[in-house]
Amino acid sequence: MAKIIKFDQEGRNAFLKGVNTLADAVKVTLGPKGRNVVIEKSFGAPLITKDGVTVAKEIELDDKFENMGAQLVKEVASKTSDVAGDGTTTATVLAQAIYRQGAKLVAAGHNPMEIKRGIDKAVETLVAELKNISKPIKDHKEIAQVGTISANNDKTIGDIIAEAMEKVGKEGVITVEEAKAMETTLETVEGMQFDRGYLSPYFVTDPERMEATLENANILIHDKKISNMKDLLPVLEQTAKSGRPLIIIAEDIEGEALATLVVNKLRGVLNICAVKAPGFGDRRKAMLEDIAVLTGGKVISEEIGFKLENTTMDMLGQAKKITVDKDNTTIIDGAGSEAEIQGRVKMIRAQIEETTSDYDREKLQERLAKLVGGVAVIKVGAATEVEMKEKKARVEDALHATRAAVDEGIVPGGGVAYLRAMSALDSLDLSTEQQFGVNVIKRALEEPIRQIAQNAGVDGSIVVDKVKNGKDAFGYNAADDEYVDMIQAGIIDPTKVSRSALQNASSIAGLMLTTEAMIADKPKEEGSMPAMPGGMGGMGGMGGMGGMM
C-alpha cells in the first residue's frame, strides 16, 4: 500500500496539533475545580468522567499524523496509570508542555539530540530531589488525605479507603464493587486471594455474577495434574457422603477428570469447583503449602508420601467460604491453627530478610500479605448508573494513589513539589544546547499548577509566581482559593505518582522531539459514484423522470 511521508517541521507541526488536541481535552479535568468530560458510548448512557486516562483512551483523530502525536501522549497517560494508578492528567499536561517548548527550540535550529540529553539529565536530578523532599506516610489521617485528593476532594471516599487499609493492613487485598444501594460502604473479610479462576464456567453457582460460592467447604490441595478419574474417586465418594462442598486446587485438571466433575456438578450430585494452583515451580509448592496451613489441610504430594487415591477427609483443608470467579479465588476464614499460621508468617519474614533478589522479595511479600492480610470490599453506591461508574473510577484511582503513597511516601500536592524540586536543576553544569533541554523542563514543571489555577478561574501566572516565592509546602489551594501550607491542609500527592508522571512524560516527549520523519498509510480515494440503474422502459434512467413532470 502507498505511504505518505512527512519530514522535519511539517511532521512536527502535525504531531504538535495531535498532542494539543488530546492534552487540551484531558487537562480540563485537572485539580479540585477541574471539569467533567462526557464521552458518547455506542450503547447505553454517555460516560461522564474526570479521569485523564479514560478521556485519553477515547480519542482518535482523523488525520493520521496528528493521530500519531495523540496516541503517543495517550501512552504517557496509560503508562502512568499502570505504574502509579493516578497522575494521568498531570503526566499529559507535562508531556504537552515539554514537547511544545522543545518543538519551538528545534524549529529555531537547535539540536534535538542535545535537547533530549538535557531533558534526561534534568529528570534524573528531579526524581532524586522528589525522593529527597518525600516524607513517609505516618498515620490513618494522611492515608485518608491522599485518598480524598485523588477522589476529587471526596472526603467520604478518602476515609473509607483509609479504614480499609487499617483493617486489612497495607499488604491486604482491597477490591471495589458496585453496590445495590445508594450509600458507599466498606465490608471486610479475612481471607486469602490468588489469581486463578475456575477451570470451567459450569462450576458457577451465581450465573448473574459468574461466580462460584462454596460455604463450609473442604479443600483438596494437590501438586500434580489430575487427568485420571480413578485417582479422584475415593475422595469424591467421601465428599458425597459428607454432603459438604469441595474445591480442588491442583496443577491442572483435564480430560476425563474435569468432564466427570462438571457432569456431577450439573446433575447436582456434588457441589464442586476446580481451580488451577497459583504460581509456578517452587513458588507454586510454597503457595500450596501456605493454603494448606491457612485451611488446616495437607498438600497431597507424592514427594512427602501422600497419594491422591489414598486421600482421607482429615487431609483436606476447610474454610467457611470460598468465592471463585473467572480470574480469582478467595478463601475466607480458613480452619488452620493460629500457631501454625504465625509460624509460617515468621518463616516468610525470615526469607524476606535473607533474599538478595528484588523479584523474590516482592513475591514473598505477596505471600505474606495473603497470609496476614484480609480482603476488604468497597461497595460503591450512587443514585444512577452513570454516577456509579464515575464514582467507582474515582474510588479505584484513590485506592491506587494511597497504595503508591504507602510505597514511596508523599510530597506537597497541587504541583508544589515540582516547583520546590526545580532548585536542584541550578546545580547542573551542562553544555549550552543541553541547558536548553533543562530550561524546557523548568518551564514544563510550572504547567500543572498553572493549569490547576486556570481550571479554578484564576490567572495561572500570578499563582505560579506567588508559589515560587514561597518556601517548603507553601502552595495554592484551588478548592478554597487560598494560599496555605499544603501538607497541613492535607493536599498531598504520592511521590510515586509525581515521579512516574514526570518520567513518562519526558520519555515520550523526548522521543517525539528527536523524530525527523513520519510515515503513514495513504488514505484510499473514494471512487466516483456508480451510475444509477436504468429506470422503467422508456424512462432512460432515473434522470428521465424530469420529462414526466
From Swiss-Prot:
Keyword Ubl conjugation on entry: no
Catalytic class of the enzyme: isomerase
GO MF term list: ATP binding; ATP-dependent protein folding chaperone; isomerase activity; unfolded protein binding
Annotated GO biological process: protein refolding
Record keywords: ATP-binding, Chaperone, Cytoplasm, Isomerase, Nucleotide-binding
EC number, as in UniProt: 5.6.1.7
Database matches in InterPro entries: Chaperonin_Cpn60_CS, Cpn60/GroEL, Cpn60/GroEL/TCP-1, GroEL-like_apical_dom_sf, GROEL-like_equatorial_sf, TCP-1-like_intermed_sf
Catalytic activity of the protein: ATP + H2O + a folded polypeptide = ADP + phosphate + an unfolded polypeptide
Gene3D superfamilies for this protein: GroEL (3.50.7.10), GroEL-like equatorial domain (1.10.560.10), TCP-1-like chaperonin intermediate domain (3.30.260.10)
SUPFAM superfamilies: GroEL apical domain-like (SSF52029), GroEL equatorial domain-like (SSF48592), GroEL-intermediate domain like (SSF54849)
CC per GO annotation: cytoplasm
Annotated function: Together with its co-chaperonin GroES, plays an essential role in assisting protein folding. The GroEL-GroES system forms a nano-cage that allows encapsulation of the non-native substrate proteins and provides a physical environment optimized to promote and accelerate protein folding.
Name used for this protein in its record: Chaperonin GroEL
Source organism phylogeny: Bacteria, Pseudomonadati, Thermodesulfobacteriota, Desulfuromonadia, Geobacterales
